[in-house]
Curated annotation (Swiss-Prot):
GO terms for cellular component: primosome complex. It comes from Methanosarcina acetivorans (strain ATCC 35395 / DSM 2834 / JCM 12185 / C2A). It comes from the Archaea. PANTHER family: DNA PRIMASE LARGE SUBUNIT. Regulatory subunit of DNA primase, an RNA polymerase that catalyzes the synthesis of short RNA molecules used as primers for DNA polymerase during DNA replication. Stabilizes and modulates the activity of the small subunit, increasing the rate of DNA synthesis, and conferring RNA synthesis capability. The DNA polymerase activity may enable DNA primase to also catalyze primer extension after primer synthesis. May also play a role in DNA repair. One of its GO terms (molecular function) is DNA-directed RNA polymerase activity. This is DNA primase large subunit PriL. Heterodimer of a small subunit (PriS) and a large subunit (PriL). Pfam families: DNA_primase_lrg (PF04104). The keyword Iron-sulfur applies.
């Protein structure tokens, strides 16, 4: 693949190998004036991701290609230093969406080669693509439009029939997954952390503004840190701009309504989704909230397991049969612990008062003796 093409897809194996062959050291990438443009582009790349769209201008000259290629590893350094799961999801989604704008215009043969880098085996038949159903399920699972459901697909001999544009859309999901799963980076070199610190501080500040804008942290009296793992995972996906399967979307929305979040607060959560439709989403939330006369409860744990939505089970999950029961139990345990701590503090205060009273009596006794 030509270097110009690799610059548009810096996350594929061939692009990584190409950058490695250039022999540019980490110290040079961080400090050399020769790569100042690449660093600036890396910073721009991350900031654009926060806004939801990474713009990729055409590159033709060798210097432009090099700058675009090297901006990706530097951007990854910044994301690693920010070290925030929601931030990582937003970044991965933006990179994947940027890739899709180019993938949809590539030739079928190019898309097949691109898919192989992600372990996706497909073939061209007549005017469509054919891919194994396991790959299809893996990468279409987060796409909530009914047309992506397996029941709405032509299925023969373990293969699914899809269009060229649909195949490109699934490749977008593969890109998002690869980038997202490449974080966190276990050990960040100290020199990288030190160099990136001022840029990371600026990016974090911008990120906080974004979170407030989308209501990602405004849960009022609701305590999200006590949510069951399945709901926490769904929330992280939504706030990262990842589409949920319909069953998980219903489960999360009904759960949040039942624990006290308002329709408006939940609507703000979905506002980061790539295909956000405010009117449609509002209708769905209000329907679950009971605007049509039927108020819905979230599904029980057995149902969550049936639909593949039981994720990240912990010790408490084994004793609970419903997500709301999990939340109620966590609140009970937290209140019990708080009462215990308050009891300790009260006991310590009483002991302190008795000790002070005893000391005063001793002081009076000593004064009498002295007289």
């Amino acid at each position: 693949m030509q270097a110009e093409k690799l610059a548009y897809y810096p996350f594929i194996s061939e692009a990584s190998a190409h950058v490695g062959d250039l022999g540019i050291s980490l110290e040079s990438l961080l400090n050399s004036r020769a790569y100042r443009t690449a660093r600036a582009r890396g910073i721009e790349r991350v900031k654009e991701a926060l806004e939801g769209e990474i713009k990729k201008p055409p590159v033709s000259e060798e210097a432009q290609v090099l700058s675009e290629l090297l901006s990706y590893p530097f951007a990854r350094m910044l994301v690693a230093c920010v070290d925030d799961q929601l931030f990582t999801r937003r970044y991965a989604l933006a990179e994947a969406k940027a890739a899709y704008t180019f993938l949809r215009n590539e030739t079928p043969d190019f898309l097949l080669e691109f898919g192989e880098d992600f372990g996706i085996s497909a073939e061209i038949r007549d005017s469509h693509f054919s891919m194994h159903f396991t790959d299809y399920i893996r990468f279409s699972n987060s796409l909530k439009e009914p047309s992506w459901k397996l029941t709405n697909r032509q299925f023969r001999a373990g293969k699914i029939k899809i269009t060229k544009e649909e195949f490109a859309r699934l490749l977008e999901e593969a890109v998002r997954e690869r980038i997202e799963q490449s974080f966190p980076i276990p050990e960040i070199p100290p020199e990288v952390s030190a160099f990136c610190a001022p840029y990371v501080a600026e990016i974090k500040e911008q990120f906080e503004v974004q979170k407030k804008k989308f209501g990602a942290t405004d849960f009022g009296a609701v305590e999200p840190e006590l949510f069951p793992p399945c709901i926490s995972h769904a929330l992280a996906n939504v706030q990262g701009g990842v589409n949920l399967a319909h069953s998980m979307r219903f489960a999360m929305t009904s759960f949040l309504l039942n624990v006290g979040m308002s329709v408006e607060e939940i609507l703000n959560l979905f506002n980061v989704s790539p295909d956000f439709d405010a009117e449609k989403t509002l209708y769905q939330i209000e329907h679950i909230a009971g605007a049509t006369g039927n108020e819905y409860k979230p599904p029980a744990c057995d149902t969550m397991r049936t639909y593949g939505n039981c994720i990240g089970k912990d010790g408490l999950c084994a004793k609970i049969s419903h997500p709301l029961g999990y939340y109620e139990r966590r609140i009970f345990l937290k209140n019990k612990e708080r009462e215990k701590e308050e009891g300790k503090e009260k006991g310590n205060e009483e002991k302190k008062e008795k000790r002070e009273e005893h000391e005063k009596k001793n002081e009076k006794g000593n004064e009498i003796k002295e007289k």
